[in-house]
Structure formats: structure tokens, C-alpha cells
């Protein structure tokens, strides 16, 4: 993943404002706190009543003068005072995209969102959940990809090639939001012998008829939703990605 994201970053930086266009830069630093009124329930959990976290996000977006190219670079940093497994350095977005008359090509890392009205969060097909960030499952990790979108009168077809798999983040032994046994993310089990280097594919068709949106998806690859098995010593849970 690091090599792919490095290429993505170099591509983004090479499309600089010096070549024309417009760049928007913004950022934020958040101080977060979680308060716990009850004592820890499981062995190993930190017993402090207050858990502090610092989150930093920078957002850089560039658009060329012709309006057919854009780039984004959005690094995300999180540091937790109690649980080191919540520490995270991620690229939510780091891509370059070119838009033609009826197609679009995107290369890099991206966070894909297909709407909140669907019965299942289909974004989970593309992006992995940052469960250590928040237990509601809404926080996502950036996904390295190459995508091609074709626009036709009968609908929109988008294909995704994802050359690297992102493992789900989990709270560590010290964390309060965890199951009785902590999840051992260092010893994840994969069904595929390629492990995190397995190439995943997604094909999506979308269209609308009046006020009705239609979306059909075909996925081939490693599931973002792990199942769990106990470790050999019975002291932790191992995530299994099928």
C-alpha cells in the first residue's frame, strides 16, 4: 500500500497550482474526550475516567482551468493518550482524476460514498471501516484504487480495481470499547494466499427513473467484514478475511 500511495501522492503533487487552476486548502485540529463513569469490565482495560484524543485533518483540493482535471490530498492523523491501537495515519483521499465528455478516470486513494438511503452501507464494499475511530461504523479508511466511470443514456457504469486491502482497525487491550477478548490485528488470517495484496474488483451500475434511484453492484475480492476465531492461547480474537 505504501508504494501505491506514494505514487498517488507524487501524481497529486505534480498537478500543482503552478500549472494553472485553483487550489483550496483547509484544515482542522480537534481535541476529543471520552468520559467513563463505570469501572472497566474486562482485564487489561485502562481505568482512567477520561480518554483524550487529538485529531488533525488537512484538505487540499485542486481544479484546473478547463474543469476536466482535479486532484485531492486529505491526510488524517489521530493520536490517543490511552490506547495506542487508536493511533492512525491515513490518507482519506490522495488522487488525480480526469473527466472527459462521457467518462472519468481516477487514480489514487479515495473514499467512495453511494448514499445514505440504501438499506446497507454499500460504501463498505469499497472502503474499510475505522472501527477504532468510532463504533458506529461510519468512519472509513482511504482505499487505493483505479476507477473508470462511463456515462451513457441508459445509465452509469463504474469499474473499480483495488490493488491493496485495508484491514479493519480495532480498539486495543487498553481500550474501553472492545469485546471481552481483544482483537489481535497483527495476526489477521486471510482466505486468499495473496493476503492484503489480493486485487479486488467492483462493477457498479446506477441510473434513475423519475424519483427512483437504481444501483446494482458486483464484487469480487476480500470481504471488508471480518469474522473472528480465538487465538491458539485463547487470549485474543483473530480477524479472518474471506
Where are these regions (language model features)?
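Sec-dependent signal peptide recognition
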Residues: 2-8
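Hydrophobic h-region of N-terminal signal peptides that target proteins for export
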Residues: 10-18
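Transmembrane beta-strand segments of Gram-negative outer membrane beta-barrel proteins
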Residues: 21-40, 69-73
